[in-house]
UniProtKB/Swiss-Prot annotation:
Descriptive protein name: Uracil phosphoribosyltransferase
A single MF term (Gene Ontology): uracil phosphoribosyltransferase activity
Species for this entry: Polaromonas naphthalenivorans (strain CJ2)
Name of the encoding gene: upp
InterPro entries, per the entry: PRibTrfase_dom, PRTase-like, Upp_B, UPRTase/APRTase, Ura_phspho_trans
Coiled-coil features, chain-numbered ranges: none
Binding site for uracil: 194, 199-201
């Protein structure tokens, strides 16, 4: 699992544990997700390319390094993926944002696309897909399949939780996609939910059932 990055920072693990609690309110869950995604963004963007730039300090001119945030595209898998956006945009405010709508057929667990909106000129951009859960892997695979048609330079997948089944599925379909997660949980249940997990992330973010 060389392309799986488990983010084990104490603050990440602390906030994830608080999110797992079934009695965490919607506002608490949402706030923790924003804080956690902010922390995860540092790890996910660790290898972003830099370019040299001349900077005039109060004392002299020097060469500094900056990132080109406009080369980064955050792609939210609706609707739960939107909970990641604020945290990442706090770190890279120049990033572009795209959305892909996928819902899971309750019978087959297969993804069905209902929305797709991306920035222009996706070629040579670096894409970071955000979705709280990598469960069966079906939605992640469908999203990567669709985005690869746009010929980006790279694609990463970021989630709060995953499980061995989800990791194996995404790695088999797209071995070139790095996976970033705060936890690899035990297994899926018969309904395609991660155990022990934290429930339905979308419902917990938006207060729906």
């Amino acid at each position: 699992m060389s392309n799986v990055h488990l983010i084990s920072h104490p603050l990440v693990q602390h906030k994830l544990t608080l999110m797992r609690r079934k009695n965490a309110s919607t506002s608490t869950f949402r706030t923790l997700l924003a804080e956690l995604s902010n922390l995860m963004a540092y790890e996910v963007t660790r290898d972003m390319p830099l370019q040299d730039i001349e900077v005039e300090t109060p004392l002299e001119t020097t060469t500094g390094k900056i990132i080109d945030g406009k080369k980064l595209v955050l792609v939210s898998i609706l609707r739960a993926g939107n909970g990641f956006l604020d945290g990442f945009l706090n770190v890279v405010p120049g990033a572009r944002v795209g959305h892909i709508g996928l819902y899971r057929d309750p019978e087959t667990l297969s993804p069905v696309e209902y929305y797709f909106k991306m920035p222009q000129e996706m070629q040579e951009r670096d894409i970071v897909i955000v979705d709280p859960m990598l469960a069966t892997g079906n939605s992640a695979i469908a999203a990567v399949d669709r985005l690869k048609q746009l010929k980006p330079r790279s694609i990463k997948f970021v989630c709060l939780l995953t499980c061995p089944e989800g990791v194996a599925a995404l790695q088999k379909a797209h071995p070139d996609v790095d996976i970033y997660t705060a936890a690899i949980d035990r297994q899926l249940n018969e309904h395609g939910y991660i155990l022990p997990g934290l429930g339905d992330a979308g419902d917990r973010i938006f207060g729906t059932k």
